[in-house]
Amino acid sequence: ILVGGLMLGVLIFLFPPLYGEGYDTINALLTGECYNLFNQSFLYNYRFDAWAIVLYLSLIVFFKIFASAATNGAGGTGGIFAPSLFVGCITGFVVAEGLNIVGLPVPHQNFAFAGMAGLMSGVMHAPLTGTFLIAELTGGYDLFMTLMITSVIAYLTIIVFERHSLYAMRLAQKGELLTHHKDRAVLTLMKMDNVIETDLAIV
């Protein structure tokens, strides 16, 4: 607990947006106030520099992995839903900022929406959930087709490497995951100790 708490404290000191669920960070990015994320950070003096924004947000996404690991290791609950939105929003924003830097003007907000939908669809293995949820939360129905395409691509990509979502992964590893396949479900619920006959006559 001490090591995890110390590690988390150092990360939050260097990258303040890692503190909390991340909804304030998402709101800042969607409202065009990304420079507020630099408050009390070591890159505060570069908060209006485009390259600094890309670097800072990329580091936040990278160290979010360690922050979540430290939280879980210290006995806390890092969650799945909020971190998915957090990382997806920042990733989409970074891609948009990078395209703007190289001379391709694109709206940051739209890319942030697509990033959230894509990451949520991949993590939860639920492309429709990612599409409709982001559209409902943000009112971005004009981007419905974009969100749908992003979600489907994310889902088709992740199932190649991981068959189960994070919610079902632990159950699958324990062999306790119930599926729509009736025979497999029955075999999953069946305890072998109750089936194997042990009272045998010795000849």
Where are the regions a protein language model picked out?
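Alpha-helical transmembrane segments and immediately membrane-proximal extracytoplasmic
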Residues: 1-194, 198-203
